[in-house]
């Protein structure tokens, strides 16, 4: 039971935190230059989702399903190139190290870290909910 909770949480965060990070990036890049407050808010949210991704990647240690990695649903062979091009065209700084680290993720490492991960997972889940609520509220206010 604990193993499923940890694995599903990690996989969910890797998938949805990237999508939400990209939503914030699209907002940031799409606002007219004069909308500085909206741009700054979108940038802050994007950075928060990047931080969440970094934390999950750092602590993953193979606690995810091999099929998820094989499917390329987290990152594809085009993701890094697309991020670099987006940075060039928009001037928005995207942390490409996150994508490179995701490309290096491995599944099914030996070792039982699930119990130790529980507290981190709970914190990430709370943070993700808070960020999602904030991003949804931001999008509704536009």
Where are these regions (language model features)?
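Surface-exposed peri-terminal alpha-helical interaction modules
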Residues: 1-142
């Amino acid at each position: 039971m604990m193993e499923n909770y940890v694995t599903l949480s990690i996989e969910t965060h890797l998938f949805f935190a990237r999508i939400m990070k990209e939503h914030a990036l699209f907002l940031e890049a799409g606002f007219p230059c004069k909308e500085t407050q909206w741009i700054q808010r979108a940038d802050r949210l994007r950075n928060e989702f990047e931080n969440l991704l970094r934390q999950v990647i750092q602590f993953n240690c193979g606690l995810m399903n091999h099929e998820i990695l094989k499917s390329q649903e987290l990152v594809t062979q085009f993701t890094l190139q697309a991020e670099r091009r987006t940075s060039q065209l928009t001037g928005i700084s995207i942390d490409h190290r996150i994508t490179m680290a995701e490309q290096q993720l491995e599944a099914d490492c030996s070792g039982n870290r699930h119990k130790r991960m529980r507290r981190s997972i709970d914190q990430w889940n709370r943070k993700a909910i808070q960020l999602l609520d904030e991003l949804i509220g931001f999008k509704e206010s536009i």
